[in-house]
Every structure is written in structure tokens, then in C-alpha cells.
């Protein structure tokens, strides 16, 4: 009996680690973040917009759609592993970039569009654009846009958001091919990107106008054109993740 207990210890430790890193730590991080934001004078506005976003994505099957498409098309490249933002964490990240109503936001690999909607609803940016290569995710993004438009048409208290929907755009393409040169703020979930893809993307982003801000998960940018303005650990759908914000130098 003791033998089975001893050999089972490593397995139990692995389970404990998974519970801590994927459930308990993210739970307390989210709770702490909410407590901090709730002390602010604009919390009711943030909370209301978060509720709208959560309602829009209440029955979201983006991860399933991504996995199904990759299986059907025998895509094994880990670059297409699906992950999503947490709305409140993304709000705090975007806020660090000091977004204005004149900024153009891009989400490179936008999935079902959560980042795109968040940037527009939270900060009323000039344009919010998502570039997504996988057709089912691109399709779901546009379905969400239609759903949001219908919701804002039907709810009098939310009709102020209706004109904003015209400033959302989803593009079915590779972010390495599409011209996002008008970007002021970029978000890229670089966690699973391959080295060749990441290096090519860095070279492309280095040509952005001075002052442009880039939010990056996991990976680092070592390039003379980029200045680090923030680094920390933030909550994502897959757990806690290193995030950095860079600025294009003048």
C-alpha cells in the first residue's frame, strides 16, 4: 500500500500544480483585479461594458470551431492553438497604452473578435480591426458583429453604442500579408508563434509610425526600434501570462 502511495506522489503533485496554476491563482488574480477597479469612480461604466461583452460571447464556441477546423484540414502547426483575452485584464492592458478616440486598433490573430469589441466599447477608438486567418473564426467574428448590432438596436439604453459598430472590421487574411500600417495600437498573442513568423512580424511592425504601441503576450522583442514601456503578468483564458507593451521610437 505504501508503495502505491509513494509512486502516486509525483502524479498528485502534477495535479496540484495544474489546479494552482489554472484555477486557484487565476481566480484570485481576477478577484484582486476586480477589487482594484471597483474602487475607481468610472467602475460602473467599466462593469456595464464588461457585462455587454460577456453577453455577446455567452454562447461562444470559438475554441471548438478552431480545433474542429484544424482537425478537418490536418493542421498541426501550434501557431493556431486557440486562446482568448480576459475582458477586465484586457481593459487594464489597453489603458496602459493611453488609447484615444483617434487611434486605430488592430488585433493580429483576432479569433472570434473579443479584443476588437473590447477596444471599441471600452475606449471608443477610431477603428477597431481584427485580422484572422481561420475562416470559421472570421465567420464567427462577423456573426458577433451582427448580434451586437441587433442588440444595440433593440435596447434603448445601449443605442449609443450602435454607431460604433460601423467602425469594426474583420479581415480574413494572414497578418504577415495584410497592410496594417495605419495602426496606432496592436495586440498580438505571440505565445504560440514560431520563431520565423515572430521575426517576420517584428520586422513588419518595426515600420509602424513613431509612437505606435504593441501589446505582446509571452514573447519579447529585441529590436532597436522598440522601447519597452510595460511588463507584467496578466490573466488570459489559458491562465497567467507574461505580457509586454512596446512603443515605436521616434
Question: Which residues does each predicted region cover?
Answer:
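S-adenosyl-L-methionine
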Residues: 3-101, 140-180
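Conserved class I S-adenosyl-L-methionine
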Residues: 102-111
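Conserved SAM-binding loop of SAM-dependent methyltransferases across substrates and taxa
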Residues: 114-125
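Conserved short alpha-helix immediately C-terminal to the canonical SAM/SAH-binding motif I
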Residues: 115, 136-137
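Conserved SAM-binding motif I beta-strand of class I
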Residues: 127-132
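A short SAM/SAH-binding and catalytic strip from SAM-dependent methyltransferases
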Residues: 184-196
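C-terminal substrate-binding/active-site "lid" region of AdoMet-derived donor-dependent transferases
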Residues: 193-250
Amino acid at each position: 500500500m505504501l508503495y502505491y502511495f509513494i509512486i502516486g506522489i509525483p502524479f498528485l503533485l502534477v495535479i496540484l500544480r495544474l489546479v494552482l496554476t489554472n484555477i486557484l491563482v487565476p481566480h484570485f488574480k481576477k478577484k484582486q483585479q476586480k477589487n482594484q477597479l471597483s474602487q475607481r469612480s468610472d467602475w460602473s461604466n467599466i462593469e456595464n461594458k464588461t457585462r455587454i461583452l460577456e453577453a455577446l460571447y455567452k454562447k461562444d464556441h470559438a475554441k471548438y470551431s478552431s480545433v474542429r477546423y484544424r482537425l478537418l484540414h490536418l493542421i498541426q502547426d501550434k501557431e493556431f492553438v486557440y486562446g482568448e483575452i480576459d475582458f477586465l485584464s484586457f481593459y487594464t492592458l489597453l489603458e496602459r497604452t493611453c488609447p484615444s478616440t483617434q487611434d486605430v486598433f488592430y488585433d493580429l490573430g483576432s479569433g472570434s473578435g473579443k479584443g476588437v469589441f473590447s477596444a471599441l466599447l471600452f475606449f471608443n477608438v477610431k477603428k477597431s480591426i481584427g485580422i484572422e486567418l481561420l475562416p470559421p473564426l472570421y465567420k464567427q467574428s462577423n456573426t458577433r458583429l451582427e448580434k451586437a448590432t441587433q442588440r444595440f438596436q433593440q435596447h434603448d439604453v445601449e443605442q449609443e453604442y450602435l454607431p460604433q459598430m460601423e467602425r469594426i472590421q474583420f479581415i480574413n487574411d494572414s497578418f504577415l500579408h495584410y497592410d496594417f500600417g495605419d495602426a496606432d495600437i496592436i495586440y498580438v498573442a505571440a505565445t504560440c508563434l514560431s520563431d520565423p513568423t515572430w521575426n517576420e512580424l517584428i520586422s513588419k511592425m518595426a515600420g509602424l509610425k513613431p509612437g505606435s504601441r504593441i501589446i505582446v503576450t509571452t514573447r519579447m522583442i529585441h529590436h532597436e526600434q522598440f522601447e519597452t514601456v510595460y511588463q507584467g503578468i496578466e490573466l488570459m483564458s489559458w491562465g497567467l501570462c507574461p505580457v509586454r507593451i512596446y512603443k515605436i521610437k521616434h
